[in-house]
Protein backbone atom coordinates (compact mmCIF):
# COMPACT_ATOMS: atom_id res chain seq x y z
CA UNK A 1 0.00 0.00 0.00
CA UNK A 2 1.08 3.59 -0.45
CA UNK A 3 0.03 7.12 0.47
CA UNK A 4 0.72 10.55 -0.96
CA UNK A 5 1.83 13.64 0.96
CA UNK A 6 1.15 16.01 -1.91
CA UNK A 7 -1.90 14.62 -3.72
CA UNK A 8 -5.39 13.26 -3.32
CA UNK A 9 -6.43 10.40 -5.60
CA UNK A 10 -9.77 9.33 -7.00
CA UNK A 11 -10.48 6.02 -8.71
CA UNK A 12 -13.42 5.05 -10.90
CA UNK A 13 -13.78 1.38 -11.89
CA UNK A 14 -14.51 1.09 -15.61
CA UNK A 15 -14.59 -2.72 -15.85
CA UNK A 16 -13.66 -5.89 -14.02
CA UNK A 17 -13.73 -6.70 -10.31
CA UNK A 18 -10.61 -5.17 -8.75
CA UNK A 19 -10.09 -5.36 -5.01
CA UNK A 20 -9.42 -2.09 -3.16
CA UNK A 21 -7.43 -2.38 0.07
CA UNK A 22 -6.77 0.25 2.71
CA UNK A 23 -6.02 0.31 6.43
CA UNK A 24 -9.63 -0.71 7.17
CA UNK A 25 -9.69 -3.87 5.02
CA UNK A 26 -10.52 -5.01 1.51
CA UNK A 27 -13.51 -4.44 -0.76
CA UNK A 28 -14.28 -6.02 -4.11
CA UNK A 29 -15.34 -3.34 -6.55
CA UNK A 30 -17.25 -3.40 -9.82
CA UNK A 31 -17.83 -1.17 -12.84
CA UNK A 32 -19.26 2.16 -11.70
CA UNK A 33 -17.72 2.07 -8.22
CA UNK A 34 -15.76 5.11 -7.01
CA UNK A 35 -13.26 5.56 -4.20
CA UNK A 36 -11.57 8.71 -2.90
CA UNK A 37 -8.18 8.62 -1.15
CA UNK A 38 -7.27 11.79 0.73
CA UNK A 39 -3.72 13.05 1.16
CA UNK A 40 -1.69 11.53 3.99
CA UNK A 41 -2.20 8.46 6.17
CA UNK A 42 -5.97 8.46 5.72
CA UNK A 43 -5.37 7.82 2.01
CA UNK A 44 -3.25 4.66 2.38
CA UNK A 45 -4.36 2.27 -0.39
CA UNK A 46 -3.66 -0.27 -3.11
CA UNK A 47 -5.55 -2.27 -5.72
CA UNK A 48 -5.24 -5.87 -6.86
CA UNK A 49 -6.98 -7.98 -9.45
CA UNK A 50 -7.36 -11.55 -8.12
CA UNK A 51 -9.45 -12.67 -11.10
CA UNK A 52 -8.46 -13.59 -14.64
CA UNK A 53 -10.88 -10.97 -15.96
CA UNK A 54 -9.09 -7.74 -16.95
CA UNK A 55 -9.88 -4.71 -14.81
CA UNK A 56 -9.72 -1.07 -15.88
CA UNK A 57 -9.57 1.77 -13.38
CA UNK A 58 -9.55 5.48 -14.19
CA UNK A 59 -7.15 7.16 -11.75
CA UNK A 60 -7.30 10.91 -11.15
CA UNK A 61 -4.71 12.70 -9.01
CA UNK A 62 -5.14 16.20 -7.67
CA UNK A 63 -2.22 17.73 -5.87
CA UNK A 64 1.00 19.62 -6.04
CA UNK A 65 4.70 18.92 -6.29
CA UNK A 66 6.89 17.88 -4.72
CA UNK A 67 4.84 14.81 -3.79
CA UNK A 68 6.20 12.32 -1.29
CA UNK A 69 4.83 8.83 -1.95
CA UNK A 70 5.38 6.57 1.06
CA UNK A 71 5.21 2.76 1.13
CA UNK A 72 5.11 1.99 4.88
CA UNK A 73 4.90 -1.81 4.45
CA UNK A 74 8.18 -1.72 2.53
CA UNK A 75 9.97 1.07 4.42
CA UNK A 76 10.69 3.45 1.58
CA UNK A 77 9.39 6.63 -0.03
CA UNK A 78 9.72 8.35 -3.41
CA UNK A 79 9.92 12.08 -3.96
CA UNK A 80 8.44 13.28 -7.25
CA UNK A 81 8.98 16.76 -8.66
CA UNK A 82 6.39 16.35 -11.42
CA UNK A 83 4.18 13.75 -13.08
CA UNK A 84 6.29 10.80 -14.28
CA UNK A 85 6.89 10.44 -18.00
CA UNK A 86 5.62 6.95 -19.05
CA UNK A 87 8.13 6.71 -21.92
CA UNK A 88 11.08 7.49 -19.65
CA UNK A 89 9.81 5.08 -17.00
CA UNK A 90 9.58 2.31 -19.62
CA UNK A 91 13.28 2.89 -20.39
CA UNK A 92 14.24 2.57 -16.74
CA UNK A 93 14.09 6.03 -15.26
CA UNK A 94 12.53 9.45 -15.08
CA UNK A 95 14.31 12.60 -13.88
CA UNK A 96 10.99 13.77 -12.40
CA UNK A 97 11.36 11.06 -9.76
CA UNK A 98 14.23 12.37 -7.66
CA UNK A 99 15.13 9.35 -5.58
CA UNK A 100 13.97 6.50 -3.44
CA UNK A 101 14.68 6.82 0.27
CA UNK A 102 15.04 3.74 2.48
CA UNK A 103 13.49 5.07 5.68
CA UNK A 104 11.39 3.61 8.50
CA UNK A 105 7.79 4.75 8.07
CA UNK A 106 5.43 4.14 10.96
Name the predicted role of every residue range.
Residues 17, 23-41:
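Short acidic-glycine-tyrosine-enriched beta hairpin
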Residues 44-46:
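Short beta-alpha junctions and helix-cap segments that line functional grooves
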Residues 48-106:
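Double-stranded beta-helix
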Amino acid sequence: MHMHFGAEEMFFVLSGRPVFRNQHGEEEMAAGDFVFCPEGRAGLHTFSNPTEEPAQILAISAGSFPDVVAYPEHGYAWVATRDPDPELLARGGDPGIITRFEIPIE
